Amino acid sequence: FNGAAPIACNNEHFGKAENILAPGRGINMGDGWETRRSRGKNFDWLIIKCATAAQVNKIQIDTHHFKGNYPDQCSIQASLVKIKPSAKKIVAMSKKWKQLLNKVKLKAHKKHNFRNKLIKKSKINYIKINIFPDGGISRIRLLGKVN
C-alpha cells in the first residue's frame, strides 16, 4: 500500500480511514479505522485507491486492539478503473464492482490472512472494504503481483 490512499468512506466516527494504511501494526484502537455503532441492515465501507494496478494474491485484515468493537464480517470489492474520476463518481461506480473477497467472519484482536478465498484474479487498482455492520479495523494489506 505504499502510495495507496483512501478516497471515500461513509463513517470515520472513532478513527480516521487513513489509519488503516499506516505502516506496522496499530498501537491502539485510535490508530485504526473505526465506525460508530449502527443497527439494522446497514454496513460501513471504505474505498482505497491502490498505489499501482496489481493482481492480488493475499489479503491481510488486522483487527489488532479491537476486542468488543471489531466488525462481525467483511467483504472486499475491487475494480480496475482506467479513468481518473472524482470521489463522488468512484463511490457510484463501486456499487457495481465485483467481489474480490466474499463476506467472511472476523475475530477480535487478530491478523486474518485470506489467500484461498479470493475470487477476482485480474488486475485491480481500487478496493472497497465493506464491514458488517460496523466496527474497527487496525490495518489492511494487499499482497500480489504488479505486471
Predicted regions and their residues:
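Trp- and acidic/polar-enriched beta-sheet ligand-binding modules for extracellular glycan
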Residues: 1-45, 55, 65-147
